[in-house]
């Protein structure tokens, strides 16, 4: 592979130096990737088969305990070889992504350089005016500076996207609050008439470089620095262009000070409006997520808590009816009380929520966050953020052993021991659904009610504040082929992440291997994208059903978990996820832009909008996403409050253990078969039968979760079992309410 060299033209060549050029040899990356691919192929084609043959010979000629031990060791060695192959391929794939990113950045930088060269040449060809001031040199200097700034932004954008694709935290972009800004320089006139600038005597340390750029060269305060060629100066000198007295071009330092020319399509959001500046110097904008909406007072819009578990204990609940699930808002103080122990706060919050009912889900009007953005959540009752985003609520520990104890598709755990009547709901009361957590606001933005359906653009300050810090969230999984296409498309657009790219990656991750249970016959997801960037998902199973291994990112809404829509209406979508995202958009005053799914999933359907088809090469090998588990999606407040309860108090939120200490009969397999069987039917009542079977399964799943919670050996196991108990109680009650006669 031939290394792409920077443009060497007189004017354009000055826009591909320093931070405006990825100073990495892509051929070295390609060579390293080829070596790792060769290692992986050798392990696959030679080492592992040879070891397997030796193991078989050993098994044929040796028996006894010694032979068994030897076979175990052989299996372990083969397993290590196979793991080495996997790791070699993963490393090679990352190197290929890096190689591609470097090539894209260099190609685009040279295209900008070529355009700058042509523009500057046309300016100089105008000739000296017969009268008036000769502004050619100043215009050339400005055009070079514009091209250089464009390339700096482009290289930073490519490097940050590459970092997100590789799952690493990208470096802070130049101009990020806290990064040093260089002291602006004072223009001066050289003795020979050349235009240049000299340092004012001191400069701050150089800002951190991008992922591609090498460290900037050191500077001497008494030596002129350069960006430009020999340009005879008859016009006013500009502080943004430097030349050497000898006329020979020198690679420039990264430019931070000075006003950057306005551009029509900057790829970055503006930096924080309150970022400190040095001597009036401006800094290149920083990358960051869009701000979340706030009320006019500057505080976060109160997030309505989900209708929760009733007073004190789960066993003291009275059956709830669909009439009790109203749209009355619950005061945030219900879960934000500061008095009492966490257990008392949890019980009080559940009691208050049970009395007033859940409130409808509220959508923000800010665009969805781009890939790699650090969304966070703020617990109810906390003070509005003033100096940074709040930490997301913690979950109840790893779900490992409970998946077997709680069982069922997705590791589901279960309800109270009595199958619930369709009209009355799950015994022990309901834990109805709640909205997903609302990200904390970045700056005061006035947001109208959702019903108006009119999106409001964030103010400049709010948009700038979006580039702030926060916990880095793991990127959405993406296949190598899709990552390359996205990078190329974004580079061509010369802009940030399109919401379609984010939505498509989420849709692909939901369709990845391991995100669907083997027992879930014909289960699939559909992802919708609205015109204002909202992402909504729906599947063809039940109401608010999510497989246990699936986590949804913070910015994703689930159509059937929206409590502002009646259970009966949500039941009418069951088994039809495309209809679900359409109705969700209509209900929330949104315009659907596209639906995203595989070709088979979109076959014989017409959503009335663009169909974005997922190809096999778009699907990543692993679809695990950072985000909310299924209880956090449908009942975020209950999940957050449960996380605050100490391990010793966990048993206090459970109903009493059954008198029979033996585990309940495991009928989850047969009951789940009844859930999916209606999907194979063409009967007009298949949706009703599907939901009826879901209620029965949810009741049995609660029973197993309750047993697992009372018999768990470790606090983490007990906590996870309780989460499963609450989840299946929510789903069972919601489904029963949906089936109840109007």
From Swiss-Prot:
Sequence ranges of Pro residues compositional bias: 205-218, 386-401, 433-447
Cysteine pairings via disulfide bonds: none
Protein origin, superkingdom: Bacteria
Deletion consequences: Loss of DNA conjugation when disrupted in recipient strain; strain still secretes EsxB.
Residue ranges, annotated region (Disordered): 167-471
Compositional bias annotation for Polar residues: 318-331, 358-368
Biased composition (Low complexity): 421-432, 448-464
Additional information: In the well characterized mc(2)155 strain this gene is interrupted and its 5' end is replaced; the last third of the protein is nearly identical in both strains (from residue 468 on in this entry). DNA conjugation in M.smegmatis is unidirectional with distinct donor and recipient strains; mc(2)155 is a donor strain while MKD8 is a recipient strain. Mutations in a donor strain that alter DNA transfer do not always alter DNA transfer in a recipient strain.
Protein task: May be involved in the ESX-1 / type VII specialized secretion system (T7SS), which exports several proteins including EsxA and EsxB. Involved in DNA conjugation in the recipient strain.
Identification of the protein by name: Uncharacterized protein D806_0078
Species whose genome carries this gene: Mycolicibacterium smegmatis (strain MKD8)
Lineage, top ranks: Bacteria, Bacillati, Actinomycetota, Actinomycetes, Mycobacteriales
